[in-house]
Amino acid sequence: MNMQFRNSSSAAVMAARFLFFPLLVLTLFWADTGKAEILLRDAAGRQVRLAKPAERIVTNESLLLLELALIERDPVSKIAGWAAPRRLDRGVYESFRQRFPTIDAVPVVGGVVPSNTNLESLLSADPDVFVVSLWDPGWQEIAAALEAAGVPTIFLDAPGKSARNPAEAIAFSIDLLGKALGREPEADAFSAYMLSHYQAVVDRLASVKTRPLVLMDAFAGTECCSVPGGANRLTDYLTLAGGRSLGADIIPGYEGRLSPEAVIGEDPPVYIGTGGPHLAGQGGLVLGGGMDAASARASLQAVLSQGVRKELTAVRGKRAYGISHQLAISALSILAFECFAKWVHPELFTDLDPAGTLDEINQRFLAVPLEGTFWIELGETP
């Protein structure tokens, strides 16, 4: 595997700032107003103009809160409206509520997808900018209408399969937000930190010839198994971490289902289930904010005792793991990536410490520390 991210030294990071991220940003200062106009190019290749650093953001994805918390000391104050806040891990939401009680007053506007969004709802929040986390062609019409009303739209996700690898895509997204909010130093610092951690893993994998097969059991519940397809970023993370995702070669889209017969026929040596608090009422894998390790492990054990899972070599050999789905698809995906690398190639990464990485991110970057159990190993000593 031959892949190079930005150099982790600060001087080299700044010197090579746009090697992987051709993000066009021009800031024009007007002496008569004291304001700065910002021009940037988003993930969809669109040139976006902001009259000044954004103070009021409306977004279609409540998970943007974590991204904002990496570069803003008061991320909640920047959110003028959002869609589906209940999608957030409730333990994480409660942590933010303790620090920023006004989070409960953030209005719910629009929807996660364009078909559930109307222009009037978005405009009612009086936004400086509308931020879209996941591309959908339907957003283009809404973006055009917002533009006509004087509100720019920033796409953090590219249409189609991105040419950027997962680490580059996250850094690009952080970079965009940093420019839009006038928080470039903070965005630079986190991007450099994250990319250096990705690079350390990728460098060590360069000489590895074997790529173990992994069952990535998405939203692990009573039935097995829904798996990420070839176009899913989870598949990209696992590939970059030196593994192969079962089913990704036959499921070209975002996700699909594998029959129990297909799963046991392949009998992958590694099992990774994803879950979250929202699966508690469905008999699924529950882990996340505010949860202790013993409860998370018990949940993983319960899921693994069901159906075909208990027959797998991975489960019998205690190479079975669980991880927060939201963590894995968030701006903090470096934590999931380090877990994947450690689980897929344990002999190569005995010293890799995702928990230590989380501690450092909590101390150096996050406005609200991420506390709870976001990943668990079946073979760990309780």
Q: Residues of each region from the PLM?
A:
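N-terminal secretory signal peptides that target proteins for export/translocation
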Residues: 1-14
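Bacterial N-terminal signal peptides
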Residues: 16-29
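Extracytoplasmic ligand-binding site segments that recognize negatively charged/polar headgroups
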Residues: 86-91, 138-143, 156-174, 209-233, ...
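Structured C-terminal subdomain patch of bacterial secreted/periplasmic proteins
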Residues: 110, 164-182, 188, 192, ...
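Bacterial Sec-exported substrate-binding components of ABC uptake systems
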Residues: 30-69, 185-218, 349-382
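Short helix-initiation/N-cap motifs at beta->coil->alpha
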Residues: 43-45, 104-118, 251-260
